[in-house]
UniProtKB/Swiss-Prot annotation:
Keyword Mitochondrion: yes
GO cellular component, as recorded: mitochondrial inner membrane
Protein name: Cytochrome c oxidase subunit 5C-2
Lineage: Eukaryota, Viridiplantae, Streptophyta, Embryophyta, Tracheophyta
PANTHER family attached to this UniProt entry: CYTOCHROME C OXIDASE SUBUNIT 5C-2-RELATED
Entry's localization field: Mitochondrion inner membrane
Gene: COX5C2
């Protein structure tokens, strides 16, 4: 009954360098997306105040 041995892979712990690289890449990607979102909101706000200053729009409702 002495069957053959099955070769099992050796389980290793997480690679610290790999974890650091993955964390850094994900952090930079998320930061870049957040910055792009922030710049877009800033552009919208600046355009709104430019139109408000030119008198093209108003925040007061016209009474007719």
């Amino acid at each position: 009954m002495g069957g053959g041995r099955v070769a099992h892979p050796v389980l290793k712990g997480p690679s610290v360098v790999k974890e650091l690289v993955i964390g850094t890449v994900l952090g930079l990607a998320a930061g870049g997306l957040w910055k792009m979102h922030h710049w877009n909101e800033q552009r919208k706000t600046r355009a709104f105040y430019d139109l408000l200053e030119k008198g093209e729009i108003s925040v007061v409702v016209d009474e007719e």
